[in-house]
Amino acid sequence: QRFPQRYIELAIVVDHGMYKKYNQNSDKIKVRVHQMVNHINEMYRPLNIAISLNRLQIWSKKDLITVKSASNVTLESFGNWRETVLLKQQNNDCAHLLTATNLNDNTIGLAYKKGMCNPKLSVGLVQDYSPNVFMVAVTMTHELGHNLGMEHDDKDKCKCEACIMSDVISDKPSKLFSDCSKNDYQTFLTKYNPQCILNAP
């Protein structure tokens, strides 16, 4: 399967709780986020998607939305904030919020399916739940996958243990997308052809 080249200009926002979690050390957070983006890039390379971090905003003074442990509420607030505030400051294709808040229902991430390029829906929420940066990167890769039209791997149809779009994260997640995920992405491209990811940054 050969995929056309696409480029995602990603904005990552770090909430105030995460800023405090890393002892208000912005440099430490920057290093962590850059490592995360490197991992995400590696996982998307087989799909011919290049991810660039085009903005990193750290909410060092206070949260600019109310971050609640109800992930769907926080995701909706963040989507509204992206549309009304962030996009007016700087263009981006997609924005993800990294939070130190413990999300409800054993959730470690949430994103709108097929949201890519939509002003309000091209967002994700990821909990910085593990000291291991790769584990958090896999979660963001998973949530970006939803933005790109991917469903969870069906246990029967997708023979892929611990692949990125598995509905539960494994202790040793793989760096691979299942064939199902690749097909979902191909379908999304064909059906919607999201324009914002066509241009190189």
From Swiss-Prot:
Q: Which domain of life is it from?
A: Eukaryota
Compartmental location: Secreted
Record-annotated residues binding Zn(2+)?
A: 142, 146, 152
Required cofactor(s)? Zn(2+)
Q: Just give the chief location class.
A: secreted
Q: List the disulfide bonds.
A: 117-196, 158-180, 160-163
Molecular function per GO: metal ion binding; metalloendopeptidase activity
EC top class, in one word?
hydrolase
Which Enzyme Commission number(s) are listed?
A: 3.4.24.53
Residues annotated as carrying Pyrrolidone carboxylic acid in the record are: 1
Q: Name one GO biological process term.
A: proteolysis
Task: List UniProt keywords, sorted A-Z.
Answer: Disulfide bond, Glycoprotein, Hydrolase, Metal-binding, Metalloprotease, Protease, Pyrrolidone carboxylic acid, Secreted, Zinc
- A cellular component term, taken from the record's GO annotations: extracellular region
Domain Peptidase M12B, by residue range, is 6-201
InterPro entries reported in the protein's UniProt record:
MetalloPept_cat_dom_sf, Peptidase_M12B, Reprolysin_adamalysin
Regarding tissue, the record states:
Expressed by the venom gland.
Active site as annotated: 143
What the record notes about the co-factor is: Binds 1 zinc ion per subunit.
> Which PANTHER family does the protein's record reference?
ADAM A DISINTEGRIN AND METALLOPROTEASE DOMAIN, DISINTEGRIN AND METALLOPROTEINASE DOMAIN-CONTAINING PROTEIN 28
Give the family per the record: Belongs to the venom metalloproteinase (M12B) family. P-I subfamily.
Q: How does it assemble?
A: Monomer.
Give the function comment from the record. Answer: Major venom non-hemorrhagic metalloproteinase.
Q: What is this protein called?
A: Snake venom metalloproteinase trimerelysin-2
Q: Which source organism? A: Protobothrops flavoviridis
User: What are the top taxonomic ranks of the organism?
Assistant: Eukaryota, Metazoa, Chordata, Craniata, Vertebrata
